[in-house]
Amino acid sequence: MKRPAIVSALICLLLLTACSEPDKPSIALYLAVQRGDLDQLERHLHWGTDINAILPYGQYPLQTAAQNGRIIMVRNLVKHGAEIDRTTTAGDTALDLAILAGRTQVADVLLAAGATLDASALLLKAAANGVTDRDTVRFLIDHGADLEHRNDNGDTPLLVAIRQDNHRLATQLVGQGADVNVRAADGDSALGLATRLNAPELVSLLKRQGARPTSD
């Protein structure tokens, strides 16, 4: 091959490479993740932005993407080395945030990538957060959540739901087999607690399911 031909070939190759290289990102990574801007995320990934650096509001990019249900973003971040089990300043992992937000499809992606799940502890946290999403509850139970697991105060998820007068969650938990005769740390029954807290809907629910008062 003659020299001019070689030079021309090299120039063409350089031009093709330049054309295939994405522009540098024009917005911060945290904005790209918040907005679900895949183009900007790809730019950050190409130009070497640290995807395991904490964002201004205490989360990491993977956690924000997971919480917002950005499946493609989550896959891309994991593929490029995002630390799956890193926790926020509040102690939540990307998987925790996805499940608590009802993003069960994202949760499946994270589990497949090796994320760690403590389903029993997270069900208690979901109850404490006032979660009512049926998919969230079902997902945690399907992944081994113990309905009778207790928090530091001695409450099961059902007792937490009763304390919050969360009828929807209590209904779901009872429907999944939660013990309606469970007792709190002070010996009060679920029915006794609901009665004392003046929660008539919960009292009715528990009685229909055969709950007994404390004195029994």
Predicted regions and their residues:
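Post-signal-peptide N-terminal segment of Sec-exported extracytoplasmic proteins
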Residues: 27, 31-80
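Bacterial N-terminal signal peptides that target proteins for export
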Residues: 1-8
